[in-house]
Amino acid sequence: MVRVFITGSSDGLGRMAAQLLVEQGHGVVLHARNERRGQEALAAVPGAETVVIGDLMSIAQTRGVADQVNRLGLFDAVIHNAGAGYREPRCIATEDGLPHVFAVNTLAPYILTALIQRPKRLIYLSSGLHRSGDASLKDLAWENRPWQGQQAYSDSKLHDVLIAFAVARRWPDVLSNALEPGWVATKTGGPGAPDDLDAAHRTQVWLAVSDAPAATVTVTGWTHIYCWTAMCGLKSCGRLAKPMIGV
């Protein structure tokens, strides 16, 4: 049995991944941003161990999520599934004065990666839109640029890939991977999304628990079990990760 913590698992792909992991006999801890959603998540995934509560828009609450997770003991895998902010028409500021999309998609997985006891595997959900992300890493918090919602989302998804690469460089004993779930019919993707929803959550589950040779590698991009090539290429992503995380 593998023990897995999944952020953003109260609905969507995170909940689907949790349900599949429980069906396979693994231990799962859920995450939701508030108590109401947490209870809904437990009802939807009754085999889960428990649910951790905290809004990833908030730095303080994100740190609180890490504290709650650490009190539950070691995990074999952490899936950074939570995401938000696709095409936000205006910049929504958090209590910390940061853009909502940056706080949830970039800063939260960074903080959780730094604070949660190191698992054997780390999985980061990116997007095909990472290819349009700004690789300069300038103005991460959109303090100087006019707001562009889709660009902000693309930037954040490139950041997720870079975090995965930076972790792989710093922690060679951890399997660190990023994946693209495809354009699927979730709240973010919309009802007209063309890709296979039933396949979208399976890649993160596979990366979390499989002993297949292809799943036990690091700094690789995946979508629906098929390898994809990052916009900047593997060597370039590794280079770009250095200024972002200092490794």
Language model segments and positions:
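Conserved glycine-rich Rossmann-like NAD(P)H-binding loop of the short-chain dehydrogenase/reductase
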Residues: Q24-E40
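Canonical Rossmann dinucleotide-binding motif of NAD(H)/NADP(H)-dependent dehydrogenases/reductases
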Residues: M1-V29
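Rossmann-fold cofactor-recognition segment
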Residues: V45-A60
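Catalytic loop of short-chain dehydrogenase/reductase
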Residues: G83-E88, P99, R121-D173, E180-A193
